[in-house]
A protein has these predicted regions:
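Segments of small-molecule ligand-sensing domains
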Residues: 327-394
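Solvent-exposed, acidic/polar segments of extracytosolic/periplasmic ligand-binding ectodomains
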Residues: 269, 297-298, 368-421
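Short beta-strand elements at the ligand-binding edges of bilobed clamshell
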Residues: 144-168, 300-312
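An alpha-beta-alpha
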Residues: 72, 153-213
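Extended repeat-based interaction scaffolds and adjacent low-complexity, acidic/S/T/P-biased segments
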Residues: 1-50, 86-89, 107
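Beta-alpha junction/loop-to-helix N-cap segments that form part of ligand/metal-binding clefts
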Residues: 64-68, 82-144, 153
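Extracellular/periplasmic periplasmic-binding protein-like sensory domains
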Residues: 227-237, 253-255, 271-344, 358
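Periplasmic-binding protein-like
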Residues: 107-119, 137-139, 178-183, 231-264, ...
């Protein structure tokens, strides 16, 4: 645990390790240091003294970029206030001109790390440069593989959340899923649904049924659950026996859970529709998009029992950094609050990319989730679990002795499930 406190100053971590090594020279680990400790030493040596941040100051991405910049500065001043070493930071406007020229400008300023750009096309342009001279942390994802060995990708991918939901369901013994997602022009709903389905099936699950919806939740959930087929069978039986027999419709029985891809407004219609169509006993799982980000018990009562993943920054509002941010930005960042949190983690990553890239199973317990890096140098997130109770989101307790799936721990968890009504 001497080296597994990723939010502390890495110099302090290393000093604690050196002190422990001197005091416990007879310990096997003192002479056979784990890879993560060697990576920590390297991270201290290679920590960038100057960081350039490429963000747009105008255009359609200016609002999101402003929230990211505020989060990055909040983390910077928090570290400075705690006496931790901090880099010199240069903010460069990426909304004008050639991104390669701007990148070269960052290098002339002595940048040992570049954070950004946020724009997807600009990120792809840098990713295609095989010999990027310094580590570069883009704030968006590219399509396909990056040629640049020093390029790292970080974003708030909803697909990460969908895969985490799939893993949790399998751990809890749920192997038959119904998937419900919105039809939208961007294809966002389908991408999230596909990410869940692919991971669920990789782990041995079966997607029994899936439906997309637009503006008629009652008809959509009725079709998803096969209630219409049940009613049709009853009508056929009545015609066959020529009697008005008693009948209660049933939903299809090959479903263990419903994976719901929805924003708050959509979910407030769909969950009651699921209940109406005899699915009130089914666990409903969702991504963080189901929660608006601030409690609204009067509007979210219908979501009681829905389980979803959410970033720690949204669920845990009592930290010192939250208080500092509230003083600096009393009105918050509205719909960009999660991008503010992304800025916080972008700063905290600046000294730890080396460790995450070189040490398997290493992670940063960030405010956007537990961050780890895959073989393509893409940062992946694991979020905390919550459910709606009395219309308000609450952290879900973890069963003692299980492997936690929360952002501060390991993989999937056995967690206490609420009543679905």
């Amino acid at each position: 645990r001497l080296y597994r406190d990723p939010l502390s100053d890495i110099d302090g971590q290393l000093a604690n390790l050196d002190d422990w090594q001197r005091r416990r020279a007879d310990h096997p680990a003192a002479t056979n240091m784990p890879d993560i400790i060697q990576a920590l030493r390297r991270a201290v040596r290679e920590r960038p003294q100057t960081v350039a941040v490429l963000l747009p100051q105008s255009g359609p991405l200016a609002g999101p970029a402003s929230a990211i910049r505020d989060g990055l500065l909040a983390a910077y001043y928090s570290a400075l206030g705690q006496g931790h070493p901090v880099p010199v930071i240069h903010f460069l406007d990426s909304s004008q001109g050639d991104i390669v020229a701007l990148y070269n400008q960052a290098l002339t300023l002595g940048a040992g790390l570049v954070i950004g750009p946020l724009d997807k096309e600009q990120a792809a342009t840098l990713a295609a440069i095989a010999d990027l001279p310094v580590p570069t942390l883009t704030l968006n994802y590219i399509d396909g593989d990056a040629a640049a060995a020093k390029l790292f990708q970080y974003g708030l991918a909803p697909e990460d959340e969908a895969r985490q939901v799939a893993e949790q369901a399998i751990v809890e013994g749920m192997t038959l899923a119904a998937v419900l997602y919105p039809t939208d022009s961007s294809g966002w709903g389908l991408r999230v649904a596909n990410a869940f389905s692919q991971r669920f099936q990789e782990l041995g699950g079966i997607v029994s049924t899936e439906s997309s919806y637009t503006d008629n939740p009652t008809a959509t959930t009725r079709d998803l659950l096969g209630v219409g087929q049940s009613e049709a069978r009853a009508r056929a039986m009545r015609r066959y026996v020529n009697q008005n027999i008693e009948f209660e419709p049933r939903r299809r029985q090959d479903i263990d859970l419903v994976f719901l891809v929805a924003n708050p407004g959509q979910a407030r219609q769909l969950k009651p529709a699921l209940n109406f169509h005899y699915a009130s006993d089914l666990p409903v799982f969702a991504t963080s998009h189901i929660y608006a980000g601030s409690p609204a018990p009067d509007r979210d009562t219908d979501l009681n029992g829905v389980r979803f993943v959410e970033m720690p920054w949204i669920l845990e509002s009592g930290s010192a950094l939250h208080q500092e941010a509230a003083r600096a930005w009393p009105d918050g960042h509205g719909r960009f609050e999660k991008l503010f949190a992304m800025g916080v983690d972008a700063y905290r990553l600046h000294a730890r990319l080396v460790m995450l890239a070189s040490v398997p199973d290493s992670f940063l317990p960030g405010v956007t989730g537990q961050l780890s890096m895959n073989e393509k140098r893409v940062l992946e997130r694991r979020l905390n679990w919550a459910w709606f109770r009395k219309g308000q989101p609450q952290r879900m307790p973890v069963v003692a002795g299980s492997t936690s799936g929360d952002a501060g721990h390991g993989r999937a968890a056995n967690i206490v499930a609420p009543a679905t009504r």
